């Protein structure tokens, strides 16, 4: 029995080593995070089927005299049995992928075991199917909670799976005496080894994914800090003064030896190692930067020669260079240098790729703000709604609070905030957008607001598909929804409903409606709302005034903002031409 245990431990060790190697491959880790999709399930079926086939092939042959032999077997004699790690691989397949994956791997493993032959080979097809279904059931329960079974629970399930195997041997074998004799030899070693192996396999999966999640949380926290501190300088545009401050902030927050920012032609700032010859106002020295400016793609190098600095005593040995874009055109680069090539890891690359998008958006935001100040002759443009700084910083603070609690939710909100910014930038340059884009902007805004005040607002959007390509002014619905959230409900914590709908007004016009069940508008302010700024504890009402001016400027006085208000709620609406976006 001890010899069998040691031989089984060798087989389990091989499985565990392969599991560890797989879980350190980024593609496989991403596959685990997408395990509920059918594409991922099919891929998991293939991977775990290979594990199961290997378990069968590397089993330990046991004859009637209890002699043990271990090798790679494709076919077995009719009077021998096989002890292996098949139950481990089928069980883990079910725990990870659910019933479909567990059943599939169980059937494949069982069929191959029957093909190999041996005493009562059909028994192992039956037991494999049972094990796959039962393990898949426990896996499905964990999936519904968006978790994996705990290590202790995985070990207990491994024990149960092996007991099912032993019960199947006893029940379905033709020679009961031989079955009892076989079970007395293999039961304890296989139960112990395969249950421990199942627990270790699952612990590798859980710990690897948890480590990645913690890494993402740290990255998100670092990115948020960078965004908070660099945003004011990016808004000034890409010049020497702002670039110097940005480079200092990045170097202080990230483990890099030097940071440089360039325009398309010259070095704007260089902070850290190599600053004696990488001097601002000089022409770009490195061939690496020139390559990135030409190709528009991020580049990573790990030698001095690849950096391409001509100075003989340059201490820089590795670098990652990020192109900075504005409206699709390259305007400069952000470069992070390392004096030790080993300091440039996968984490730094992932962080750099994220910063590239964020910094480019911030540059566009700053450029849009600069341009808006210069458009003195464009009345409608000057009335476009702008991103509220209070909303931005409140959103950043909310995401920061979520980073340590729920990093995945924080990541989702960060993407919503990015989409919100981009939509605002696009809206500031357009007279009209489709209703579908406007609703997407509203949903991004609501995601951020509902993260700050969970469960406080109920938003109902009732818009038929045929109206989704109707052209509307940017921020039309967002401003009305935001107005309801800020002013309609005072301190009421629940039961706050906002309804957004679009209905047909005439054959050529539609009515857009935003309705709330708040406290209503006081009579002394009703005649002023939308016509002039209205002072209140939570705002001036200028957003509604600007919106009304834009509506009338674009579509005439008939499109002016209208409303009705009682103590049980307020309804805003406007009637717009049924103009649709032309198909390209």
UniProtKB/Swiss-Prot annotation:
Q: Which UniProt keywords apply?
A: ATP-binding, Cell membrane, Hydrolase, Kinase, Membrane, Nucleotide-binding, Phosphoprotein, Transferase, Transmembrane, Transmembrane helix, Two-component regulatory system
Pfam families to which the protein is assigned, alphabetical: 5TM-5TMR_LYT (PF07694), HATPase_c (PF02518), His_kinase (PF06580)
| SMART domains, per database record | GAF, HATPase_c
Where's the Histidine kinase domain? 379-461
List the GO cellular component terms.
plasma membrane
Reactions catalysed, semicolon-separated, are:
ATP + protein L-histidine = ADP + protein N-phospho-L-histidine
Query: In which compartments does the protein localize?
Result: Cell membrane
Family matches, as PANTHER family: SENSOR HISTIDINE KINASE YPDA (PTHR34220:SF7)
Spell out the protein name for this chain.
Sensor histidine kinase/phosphatase LytS
Identify the taxonomic lineage of the organism of origin. Bacteria, Bacillati, Bacillota, Bacilli, Bacillales
């Amino acid at each position: 029995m001890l010899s069998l245990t040691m031989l089984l431990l060798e087989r389990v060790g091989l499985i565990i080593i392969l599991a560890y190697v797989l879980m350190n491959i980024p593609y496989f880790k991403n596959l685990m995070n997408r395990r509920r999709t059918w594409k991922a399930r099919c891929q998991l079926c293939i991977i775990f089927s290979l594990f199961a086939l290997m378990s069968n092939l590397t089993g330990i042959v046991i004859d009637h005299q209890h002699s043990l032999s271990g090798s790679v077997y494709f076919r077995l004699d009719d009077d021998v049995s096989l002890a292996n790690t098949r139950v481990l691989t089928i069980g883990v397949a079910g725990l990870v992928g659910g019933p479909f994956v567990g059943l599939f791997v169980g059937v494949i493993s069982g069929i191959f075991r029957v093909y190999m032959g041996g005493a009562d080979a059909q028994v192992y097809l039956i037991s494999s199917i049972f094990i796959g279904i039962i393990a898949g059931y426990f896996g499905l329960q964990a999936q519904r909670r968006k978790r994996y079974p705990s290590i202790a629970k995985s070990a207990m399930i491994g024990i149960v799976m092996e007991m099912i195997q032993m019960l199947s041997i006893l029940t379905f074998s033709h020679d009961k005496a031989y079955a009892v004799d076989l079970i007395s030899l293999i039961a304890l070693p296989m139960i112990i080894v395969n249950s421990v192996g199942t627990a270790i396999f699952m612990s590798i999966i859980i710990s690897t994914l948890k480590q990645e999640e913690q890494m993402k949380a740290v990255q998100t926290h670092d990115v948020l800090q960078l965004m908070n501190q660099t945003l004011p300088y990016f808004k000034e545009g890409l010049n020497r003064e702002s670039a110097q401050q940005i480079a200092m902030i990045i170097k202080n927050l990230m483990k890099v030896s030097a940071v440089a920012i360039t325009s398309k032609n010259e070095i704007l700032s260089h902070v850290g190692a190599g600053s004696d010859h990488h001097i601002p106002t000089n022409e770009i020295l490195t061939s690496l930067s020139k390559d990135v400016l030409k190709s528009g793609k991020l580049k990573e190098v790990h030698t001095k020669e690849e950096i391409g600095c001509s100075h003989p005593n340059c201490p820089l040995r590795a670098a990652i260079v990020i192109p900075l874009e504005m409206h699709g055109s390259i305007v400069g680069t952000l470069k992070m240098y390392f004096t030790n090539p080993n300091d440039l890891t996968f984490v730094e690359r992932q962080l750099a790729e994220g910063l590239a998008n964020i910094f480019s958006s911030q540059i566009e935001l700053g450029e849009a703000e600069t341009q808006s100040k210069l458009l003195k002759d464009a009345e409608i443009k000057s009335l476009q709604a702008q991103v509220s700084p209070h909303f931005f910083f409140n959103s950043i603070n909310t995401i920061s609070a979520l980073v340590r609690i729920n990093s995945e939710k924080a990541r989702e909100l960060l993407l919503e905030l990015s989409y919100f910014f981009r939509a605002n930038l696009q809206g500031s340059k357009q007279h009209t957008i489709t209703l579908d884009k406007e609703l997407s902007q509203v949903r991004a805004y609501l995601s951020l607001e509902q993260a700050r005040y969970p469960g406080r607002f109920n938003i109902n959007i009732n818009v038929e598909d045929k109206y989704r390509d109707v052209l509307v002014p940017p921020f039309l619905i967002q401003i009305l929804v935001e107005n309801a959230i800020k002013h309609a409900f005072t301190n009421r914590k629940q039961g706050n409903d906002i309804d957004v709908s679009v209905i047909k007004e005439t054959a050529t016009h539609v009515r857009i409606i935003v309705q709330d069940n708040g406290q209503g508008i006081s009579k002394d302010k009703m005649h002023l709302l939308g016509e002039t700024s209205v002072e209140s504890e939570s705002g001036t009402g200028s957003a509604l005034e600007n919106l009304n001016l834009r509506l009338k400027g674009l579509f005439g006085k008939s499109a002016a903002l209208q409303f009705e208000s009682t103590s049980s709620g307020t309804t805003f609406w406007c009637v717009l031409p049924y103009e649709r976006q032309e198909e390209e």
